[in-house]
Curated annotation (Swiss-Prot):
PROSITE patterns: UPF0047. Belongs to the UPF0047 family. This is UPF0047 protein MTH_771. PANTHER family: UNCHARACTERIZED PROTEIN YJBQ-RELATED, UPF0047 PROTEIN C4A8.02C. It holds the Pfam family UPF0047.
Length: 143
């Protein structure tokens, strides 16, 4: 697809309240709502977590898989290990888990829809909750 020089950019912040220390929340419909509001039909969409103890990832929304992801995080970065950062704040595991998952995801926008695969959903990973969080969604492209 050919894109001209001039693009529109639309951005919106989404508030989110989490309820558990580790929580994986499907935000696909929230993000889709921002895309619809943007009026952009072709381009890219970025979802960014504005926090260093949370993450954004794309995967299948299946309850056993989500449980496996939580187990993988605990096995890879145990909450009770000895971390230097815990001398300041007792949440080093949350920061390290966020590094592994990443703080943003970018999705192509084609004909007004996110070009996600059949089983793909966008997730917000709370890694140090419960908290009030903010997610930034930016869409760039042509209407």
């Amino acid at each position: 697809m050919k894109c001209g020089v001039f693009m529109e950019v639309y951005t919106q912040e989404l508030p989110l309240r989490t309820s558990r220390r580790v929580e994986l929340i499907d935000i696909t419909s929230m993000v889709s709502g921002v895309l619809e509001s943007s009026g952009i039909r072709n381009g890219i969409l970025n979802v960014f977590s504005r926090h260093s103890t949370s993450a954004i990832f794309i995967n299948e929304n299946e309850s056993r898989l989500l449980s496996d992801i939580e187990s993988m995080l605990e096995g890879t970065v145990p909450v009770d290990a000895s971390y230097g950062h815990n001398a300041i704040d007792n949440n080093a595991d949350s920061h390290l888990r966020a590094v592994l998952l990443g703080g943003s995801q970018t999705v192509p926008v084609i004909n007004g829809s996110m070009d996600l695969g059949t089983w793909q959903s966008i997730f917000f990973a709370e890694l140090d909750g419960p908290r009030n969080r903010r997610i930034r969604v930016s869409v760039a492209g042509k209407p």
